[in-house]
C-alpha cells in the first residue's frame, strides 16, 4: 500500500511539472507576439532547455526510485518465497510425522483386530466345547432313557406273564366251579339213592365235607384273585410312570431340534459378525479419508497455532528435566524412558496374566471337582433308590413264597386226606382225573416256587451289588471332598490376590450378563428380520462363493498397507531432499502434490483477512467488555472480577480498603444458584447476612443494604 502511494505522488509531480512547462511555453509565445523583441527568444530558449534538463533529472530520479523499489520488491518476493519454502518443508515434515502416526495407529488397529480375531476364535472353541458337553449330556440322557426303556420292556414282560397267570387262575376257578356243579349233581344222586343205599350215607357226608372244603378253596382262590387285582393296580401305576417317561422321551427330539436351531443361529451370527466387521472396516476407511480431507483443509489455518504449540512444547522440553526430576535432555531420552516404562508394563501384564491363568485353572479344577461331587451324589441317590426298590421287591417275593408254601402244604394235606379216606375199590374215574389235575397243579406250584426262589436269589445278588456300588460311591465322594480340601490348602494365595480374583470373577459374571443381553438383543433382531421377510435357515441353503468377502477385504487391507508404506518411503525421500536443500526430483514432486504458488497466495490472503477479522473482533469485544464493566460498576456500585472457575469477587466502590470484598460461588446447573463464601469482610456484616440472605434469601437486597451502609459510613466520616 505504501509503494502504491509513493508511485502516485511521483506521477502527480510529473504531471504538475508538465503543466507548468506548457503554461510557461504558452506565456513565452504570447510575449513574442506582443513585444517582438529579438533578445527574448534566446532567453526563453535557455529557460526551456533548463526546464527540460530539470525534467530529465526528475524523470531519471523517479526511474531510479522506481528501480530501487522494484529491487526491494524482488528481495521481498525472494524472502517470501524462502519463507514459503520453509513453511512447505515444515508442512511436509509435519505431514510425514502425521503419516507415521497414522501408520502406527493402523498397525495398532491391525493388532487389535488380530487380538479380537484370536478372542473370537477362543470364544468359538469354548462354544464348541460347550456343544460337545451338551452332546455328551444328551448321549448320557439318551443312554439313561434306553435303560429305562429296557426296564419298561422287562416290566411289560412281567405284566404279560402276570396276566397269563391271572388267566390261568381264572381258568382254574372255572374248572372248580364246574367241579362244584358236578359235585352238586352227585349230591342229588346220592340223596335219591339214600333210601336205597344207607351204607353210602357216610360217603355222602364225606362228599359234603369235600364240597365244603372246595368252597373254602374257592374262597381262598377269590382272595388270591383280589391280591392279583391289587397287583394289577400296582402294575397300572407302573404303567403311568412309564407313560411319564415316554412323555419325557418325546421331549428329547424337541431339545435336539432346539440345539440344531441354536447351532444354526450361531453360524448365522458368525456370518453377521464377519459382514459387520467388513462394514466397520469400510466405515473406518471412509472416516479416515474424510479425516484426511478435513485435515488437509484445516492444515493451512492451523499452521500458526501449531507454531505456537511447538514453541510451548519446546519450552516444556526445556523445563521437563526440572519438573520431572529425570535427565531428559532430548526426545530420544524421553523415548528411552517411555520404552522402559512400556517394558515394565509388559512385565507387570505378564505377571498378571500368569496369576489370572493360575486362578482360571484353579477355578476350572474346582468347578470340575464340584461337578464330579454332584454327579457322584446323584449316582449315590439313584443307587440308594434302586436298593430300596430291590429291597421292597425282595420283601414282596418272600411274602409270595410264604403264601405259596402255605398253599402247597394245604394241597398236600387235602390229597393226604383223600388218600386216607378212600379205599382202592372206591376209586372212580372222576377221582383219578381229579388226582391227575391235582398233580398238575402241584407241579405248576413247584415250578412257580422255583422261579420265585431264583428271582429272590437274583434280587438278593443285585441288592448286594448295589450295596457294594453305593459303598464305592461313598468312598469316591469322600476322596473327592478330601481332594478339594487338599487343593484348597495346597494353593495358598494372599488376600489381595484372592480379592483380585473375586473382582475378576465378578467382571466375568458382568460380561456374561452383558453377553446374555446381547444374545437376547440379537434374538429380538432375528425375530424382527423374520417378520420383515428374512429367509428360514432350516429350509434355505446358504451357498458360500469361492470369492470370499473376508479374504478380499484382507487382500484389500494388505494392498492399502503396502500403498501407505510406499507413500511413507516417498515422503521420507522428499523430507531428505528438502533437508539437503537441493532440487526436488520429479517423482517426489509428483508424490508430494504440493499446492501451486497461486493457491498459496490466495490461501495466504484468506488467512491474513481471517486474522484481521479475528483481531478486529477481539478489539471490538474488548472494548464492549470494558464498556459493559464500566456501566455495571457505575449502576450497581460493585466491580465484578472472575477469580477462578465459578467464583466471582465483588468489590464495592465505597469500600474502606481494597481487600474488603465479597466472594460468591456459582452452584447448581448453569450457575443458577450463588453461594457466599466466608471472608474477613463478610465476617464484619453478620446482621445483614442473617437478615437478607438467611431469612429473606435475596442477594440484591443484601448488596443494596451493604452499599447503603458503606455509603453512610463514608458520608458520616
Swiss-Prot record:
Keyword ATP-binding: no
Modified residues (N6-acetyllysine): 61
Pfam families linked: MAD
Location(s), subcellular: Nucleus; Chromosome, Centromere, Kinetochore; Nucleus envelope; Cytoplasm, Cytoskeleton, Microtubule organizing center, Centrosome
GO cellular component: centrosome; kinetochore; MAD1 complex; mitotic spindle; mitotic spindle assembly checkpoint MAD1-MAD2 complex; mitotic spindle pole; nuclear pore nuclear basket; nucleus
Keywords: Acetylation, Cell cycle, Cell division, Centromere, Chromosome, Coiled coil, Cytoplasm, Cytoskeleton, Isopeptide bond, Kinetochore, Mitosis, Nucleus, Phosphoprotein, Ubl conjugation
UniProt PTM: Phosphorylated; by BUB1. Become hyperphosphorylated in late S through M phases or after mitotic spindle damage.
Keyword Metal-binding: no
Residue ranges, annotated region (Necessary for interaction with MAD2L1): 540-551
Example of a GO biological process term: mitotic spindle assembly checkpoint signaling
Coiled-coil zones: 46-631
Residues with PTM Phosphoserine: 16, 214, 428
Necessary for interaction with NEK2: region residues: 380-532
GO molecular function terms noted in the UniProt entry: identical protein binding; kinetochore binding
InterPro entries: Mad1
Covalent cross-link (Glycyl lysine isopeptide (Lys-Gly) (interchain with G-Cter in SUMO2)), residues: 61
Motif (Nuclear localization signal): 79-82
SUPFAM superfamilies: Mitotic arrest deficient-like 1, Mad1
Residues recorded as bearing N-acetylmethionine in the entry: 1
Role this protein plays: Component of the spindle-assembly checkpoint that prevents the onset of anaphase until all chromosomes are properly aligned at the metaphase plate. Forms a heterotetrameric complex with the closed conformation form of MAD2L1 (C-MAD2) at unattached kinetochores during prometaphase, recruits an open conformation of MAD2L1 (O-MAD2) and promotes the conversion of O-MAD2 to C-MAD2, which ensures mitotic checkpoint signaling.
Subunit-level organization: Homodimer. Dimerizes via its N- and C- terminal regions. Heterodimerizes with MAD2L1 in order to form a tetrameric MAD1L1-MAD2L1 core complex. Interacts with the closed conformation form of MAD2L1 (C-MAD2) and open conformation form of MAD2L1 (O-MAD2). It is unclear whether MAD1L1 dimerization promotes the conversion of closed to open conformation of MAD2L1. Formation of a heterotetrameric core complex containing two molecules each of MAD1L1 and of MAD2L1 promotes binding of another molecule of MAD2L1 to each MAD2L1, resulting in a heterohexamer.
Family the entry assigns: Belongs to the MAD1 family.
Stated name of the protein: Mitotic spindle assembly checkpoint protein MAD1
Protein's organism: Cricetulus griseus (Chinese hamster)
Higher taxonomy: Eukaryota, Metazoa, Chordata, Craniata, Vertebrata
